[in-house]
């Protein structure tokens, strides 16, 4: 399988990671300057927590969705599709899971390519045709191929610390908690958290574009994924609101985020639907000319 490269997209992702790295470097310097060893101990503990979260991301995500791993004799067709697409993507076959939910969606999780899980909802299986389902599964396998769980965990780590400092930093300032430098550090942390939040969301959107492109490379059929995205989007209108609320915390994982009127474009984990469809159609035209 040949992965087609969108150098503009790669450049935007690299630039976003560069900005995050520079921001975090300055942030760590500020923390070391303003806080004593107590804060550094907390940073080490939070680093350990992030490692636990990283290594057990698949179990946490499946539990959050109420999903269960399924054997080939339980979901033979789903297993066959994922096995064939994994071979086309040059990936080990991931663990297969199903969540009993009316919300038509899917996600991939796991710390690396050898420890990945692809989960689909029963609502997704009922909603899509075989070709459309393969497009969605290929999108999730592209996330695995691109190591997106690892990338986003690394990108989010110091943002989480910045949020912690904003909430609880004054507790670790000792006798200096009322001094101006401590409050300057908290304000700096607030700025770092807001800016990094927006950069991480931008990175997430870029990686969705990359997964769409990867899915097209795996299947050779961008129109199937485009059709699946439109069908899922329409189906969301008929899903009970309580089901959507129950799964809103999984937005960043899903192929299509659960809608929320309070989330603006800058804070969204996914690109606008029309933009994704447009890029898939452009990719289809590009493939037809090759």
Locations of the language-model features?
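Cytosolic juxtamembrane N-terminal segments of multi-pass membrane proteins
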Residues: 1-7, 118, 137-141
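Active-site-proximal gating segments in proteases and membrane effectors
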Residues: 91-115, 216-290
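Alpha-helix N-cap and coil->helix boundary residues
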Residues: 77, 132, 153, 206, ...
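Active-site recognition of the HExxH zinc-binding catalytic motif
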Residues: 58, 82, 120, 135-143, ...
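Active-site scaffold of zinc-dependent metalloenzymes
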Residues: 67, 106-130, 261
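Catalytic Zn2+-binding segment of zinc metalloproteases
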Residues: 141-157, 222-223
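Short pre-active-site segment immediately N-terminal to the catalytic Zn-binding motif
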Residues: 70, 122-135, 199, 205
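Hydrophobic or amphipathic, alpha-helical segments that drive membrane association/targeting
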Residues: 1-107, 155-209, 233-237, 285-290
